[in-house]
Amino acid sequence: MATPTFDLADLKRRMQGAVNALKHDLGSLRTGRASPTLLDPIQIEAYGAVMPMAQVATISVPEPRLLSVAVWDRGMVSAVEKAIRESDLGLNPMTEGQTIRLRIPEMSEQRRKEMVKVAHKYAEEARVAVRHVRRDGLDLLKKLEKDGAISQDDEKRQADQVQKITDQHIAEVDQTLAAKEKEIMQV
C-alpha cells in the first residue's frame, strides 16, 4: 500500500472548490436585480429531452430589472415561456416573436431579509466545507508525523500553512457573503 503524501496544492484546490460552490449558489439567489444565472434552475422540455435554459436560448440583461431571453428555435418559444411560468421564481414572461422579456419585480423588505438568511446559510455551509478540508489535511499531517514520515517541526510548519490558507478561504467566503448581502439589501 502506498504511503499517503501531503499535498498543500490539493487542499487549496478543494477549499477553492467550496468557495466556488458558494459563489454559484449565491448567483442563483434572487436579488431584485436581473441576472442571467437567475434562470439557471429552469429546465426546458425540448426535442424529447429536458435541458437547461442556456441550451435553447441566449439570456441577456438589457436593463437592471429586465431579462431578455432570445429563443433560438421559433418552435421552442412556448415551451420556454411555459417553463418560466411554472418555475417558482414568480416571473411573468412577455413574448415578442422569438424574444421573451422578464421584468424582475422589486422584493419586499421581508423577502430581502429571507434571502439574506439563505445567503448566510450557504456561506456557513462553505465555511464548514473549508474547515473539513483543513481537518483532513491536519489529520494526514498528524498521521505522517506519527508514522515517522515527517518530523514534528515539519508537521507544525505544514499545519501553520494549512491554517493560513484556511483563513484566506474563510475570508473569501466572508467577502463574497458581504457583497451578496449588500446586493440583496439594495433597493
Curated annotation (Swiss-Prot):
Organism, as annotated: Methylobacterium nodulans (strain LMG 21967 / CNCM I-2342 / ORS 2060)
Gene3D superfamilies: 3.30.1360.40, Ribosome-recycling factor (1.10.132.20)
Gene name of this polypeptide: frr
InterPro entries with a match to the protein in the record: Ribosome_recyc_fac, Ribosome_recyc_fac_dom, RRF_sf
GO CC terms, sorted: cytosol
Protein biosynthesis recorded as keyword: yes
Keywords in alphabetical order: Cytoplasm, Protein biosynthesis
Family: Belongs to the RRF family.
Signal peptide: none
SUPFAM superfamilies linked: Ribosome recycling factor, RRF
Designated name of the protein: Ribosome-recycling factor
